[in-house]
Design a protein with these regions (language model features):
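A periodicity- and composition-biased signal for non-globular, repetitive helical segments
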Residues: 12-13, 139
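N-terminal export leaders
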Residues: 6-10
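Cys-dependent protein tyrosine phosphatase-like superfamily
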Residues: 22-124, 139-179
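Hydrophobic h-region of N-terminal signal peptides that target proteins for export
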Residues: 13-22
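A phosphate-binding catalytic loop at a beta-strand-loop-alpha-helix junction
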Residues: 124-135
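N-terminal secretory signal peptides that target proteins for export/translocation
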Residues: 1-4
Length: 179
């Protein structure tokens, strides 16, 4: 193989990888009645904001195997018990990980990563009230479990709705839990 052919093939490979990584970060927004800010990332995950129990059957029809709820039961509009019942009635797994924005608990991140990477839970729908907590947790998962670089994960999290309040928590967790 000549040096020119080798270089051409190498460049083609690099462009293919760059294109694949850009597609991996693409966020597809959909309107789903009863779900605010629904965003599909890939075949294994979607994130969203407030989700009414009546919307759960539609998520099941879309192929989701689990719902991971990051809302506190005490939040206005949260229907944790009814949502859990709706998820189980739709034949999906329900994981409730109450994420307190005022004092985020790093242990909760460990539980989230364990839940979202469990093959039986894929594809998973992760939500909170507005999408910020879901975006922060997903960003952490991308760096810690998927070994993405921080900037790539931050770009994706920003597209999902990462907010200024949770960005420092996510970055601190990443910096203290990666080598």
């Amino acid at each position: 193989m000549t040096p020119i052919v080798r270089r051409t093939l190498a460049l083609a490979g690099i462009f293919a990888l760059v294109g694949a990584s850009a597609r991996a970060q693409e966020v597809t927004r959909k309107q789903i009645e009863g779900v605010s800010t629904f965003a599909q990332l890939d075949t294994t995950i979607a994130c969203g904001g407030a989700t009414r129990p009546e919307a759960i059957p539609e998520l099941g029809k879309m192929g989701f195997k689990s719902v991971i709820n990051l809302r506190l039961a005490s939040e206005e509009g949260a229907q944790v018990e009814k949502e859990g019942e709706a998820v189980r009635a739709a034949g999906m797994r329900y994981v409730h990980l109450p994420f307190n924005v005022q004092s985020p608990d790093p242990k909760l991140v460990d539980d989230f990563i364990a839940a979202v990477t469990l093959p039986a839970n894929e594809p998973a729908y992760v939500h909170c009230a507005a999408g910020g907590r879901a975006a922060a947790m997903w960003m952490i998962k991308r760096v810690v479990a998927d070994h993405w670089d921080e900037q790539r994960a931050l770009t994706e999290a920003n597209a999902l709705g990462l907010n200024d309040r949770l960005r420092p928590f996510a970055l601190n967790y990443i910096h203290t839990h990666t080598r």
